[in-house]
């Protein structure tokens, strides 16, 4: 008697790392969150209980934009000391937690890393991004909200090219938001994408409705889009 054919394997969901302020386990996100690592405090703070809304808002936008179910692993990096009065959370004065979060995400073999932060051009972060991108991981980063004619996070974008992407924000009419750091006239050596980033509907950590503006909130839309692309081949690192 012939054996019955085996049922096809269930496709594995894309695993996405969100390096941010931590993510709340809201009813909408609960079935997508698989783990949270706290690189901003020792001992680690309680998982999925963020101080700030930012990471939850980013994760919600990404989940809504994804064409198929995804798994999200949260990397919480916000400083225990909070933010200066003139800064928007999440803040982290030390580059080490951010670099370590990128390396942990790389070790987990995630499909993409979402970084809706304005990072310091520190060699530890640049090297961590380069290594992630060399392993075929898409690293998607905010271009920044300073209204400049060049993007932030540029060193990282060049280091991981072509698997790193900077994202600027468009308004609902498709025009660049006034606060976006725009690509240079000659954008050779890095990728820059535009996505909706003005008054984007989302959810705060307490589950309440909100709208969000800034390149931070354009990034998860681009990340979700890139999840449908084939994973690129790894890149040989030069010695």
Which residues does each predicted region cover?
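Active-site core segment of subtilase-fold serine proteases
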Residues: 2-93, 97-100, 104-108, 112, ...
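Anion (oxyanion) recognition and catalysis
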Residues: 10, 133-134, 194
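Structural recognition of the beta-strand scaffold that forms the well-ordered cores
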Residues: 15-19, 71-76, 111-116, 138-142, ...
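Solvent-exposed loop/turn segments at secondary-structure junctions
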Residues: 22-25, 68, 78-82, 118-122, ...
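Substrate-binding/access-modulating region of protease and related hydrolase catalytic domains
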Residues: 81-160, 207-219
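An often Trp-containing, charged/polar helix-loop segment at the C-terminal end
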Residues: 231-239
């Amino acid at each position: 008697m012939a054996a019955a054919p085996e049922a096809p394997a269930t496709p594995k969901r894309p695993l996405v790392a969100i390096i941010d302020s931590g993510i709340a386990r809201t009813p909408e996100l609960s079935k997508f969150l698989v783990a949270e690592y706290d690189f901003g405090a020792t001992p680690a703070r309680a998982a999925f209980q963020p101080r700030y809304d930012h990471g939850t808002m980013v994760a919600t936008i990404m989940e809504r934009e994804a064409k198929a179910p995804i798994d999200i692993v949260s990397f919480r990096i916000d400083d225990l000391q909070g933010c200066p009065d003139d800064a928007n959370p999440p803040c982290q004065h030390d580059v080490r937690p951010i670099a370590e979060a990128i390396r942990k995400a790389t070790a987990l073999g995630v499909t993409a890393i979402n970084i809706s932060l304005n990072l310091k051009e520190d060699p530890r972060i640049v090297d961590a991004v380069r290594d992630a991108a060399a392993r075929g991981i898409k690293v998607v980063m905010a271009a920044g909200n300073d209204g400049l004619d060049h993007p932030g996070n540029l060193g990282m974008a060049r280091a991981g090219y072509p698997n790193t992407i900077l994202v600027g924000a468009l308004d609902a009419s498709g025009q660049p938001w006034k606060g976006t750091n725009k690509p240079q006239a000659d954008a050779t050596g890095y990728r820059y994408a535009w996505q909706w980033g003005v008054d984007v509907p989302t959810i705060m950590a307490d589950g309440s409705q909100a709208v969000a503006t800034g390149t931070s909130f354009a990034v998860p839309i681009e990340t979700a889009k890139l999840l449908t692309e084939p994973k690129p081949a790894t890149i040989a690192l030069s010695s």
